[in-house]
Structure formats: C-alpha cells, structure tokens
Amino acid sequence: MKCGGGCHDGLVAPSEDPEEHVAPAAQRVRAGTLLLANTDLFEPTFRRSVIYIVEHNDGGTLGVVLNRASETPVYNVLPQWATLTIKPKTMFIGGPVKRDSALCLATLRAGVDPEGIVGLRHVDGRVVMVDLDADPDSIAPVVEGVRIFAGYSGWTIGQLEGEIDRDDWIVLSALPSDVLIGPKTDLWGQVLRRQPLPLSLRATHPIDTSRN
C-alpha cells in the first residue's frame, strides 16, 4: 500500500513555536488546518472526526482523518516503517477514498528544515508528508515519528465549501501534536476545548445523543 508519485507522498511536522499551544479559532481552509465534524454530522464515516488538510488548491481538497485507528499493524503492510511509527503502531483510516493506498505524515524534530531532504514534502509548520518509497533510515534522524493512513478524504472544487456552508464542518487551526496524537486521546474533544467560548462548550456534547 503506497501513495505513489509526488502527489501524496509526504509528511508534515509540528514546531516548537509557543503559538502551537494556543490555536486560534475559525479560519480559512488551507493545508495544515483541521476540519472538525460538527455535532450534527451523524454520517458514520465522519462522525466526531478530525481531518487534517494536506492539500487545498484549484484541484480540490485532500485530507486524512486523524482519529480513526484500525487494528491492522503497520508491520503487516509496510514493515520497514513500523519502527518509526508512533503508538499505536497500526494503520489509521484516512478516509473512504483509495483505501488500498497509503499516505504518511510525520512531525519534524525541532530546528529541522525539510528543504532539500529527499523523501519529505512540507505541508505546514513541522508537519511533512513522507514518501513511503524513501529509505526509513534516512528519515529517522529528522522526524519525531510517523503515522500511516490507509486512504484519504477528498473533495472536488466547491464541494467542501458547500459542506462548510451547511455547517457540517468547523475549520480550525491545527497543532503539530494533533498529527501524532496518542491512541487514548479524545482528539475531537481536545481540539474543541482549546477554542474560545462558546465553541469550546461543544466538547461536552454527548457521543450518543439519545443520552442527552
């Protein structure tokens, strides 16, 4: 499972900037922003999902769901990348598109400039895309870890804007740490809680609305 070519072959890494710790609320969609599923989005594929935008241009929008771990070990699919993969060392479900392909994101170590490093493509801040055809041994010294996604989420021109207009998604700033979030973290709630009021109150929204 590989994401071939230069289109989806990179990782993005977080920075040590103080700004990482306070993410401002709503902004325009661009590479490096988050799409947070609104509380009324009940479609199973994207309910309470947090999507990291990897590309946003005239050709459309591409992102990966950050909080959908699978049970498939990375070692079973791409064994050469298993050591660099952050726990849980499983494939994540990046979205419904091309589930038989893989896309890899990483966070750079503090102070590393991705410019000129073979196998890395800068996304935003310290987040980069990693070419899965690259040599993991050459990537290891410059990244804190990688996460590999099966498939991705994609929108054609204007499609995402329409979904945002009907309040399916909230556009927010990402922190580098979001990309490699731990397995037991409620990323959806965590992202909301760091927003200003009243948006942060949505983090208390019950998972099962029948309990409300």
What are these regions (language model features)?
Residues K2-N212:
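A short aromatic-anchored loop/beta-hairpin motif
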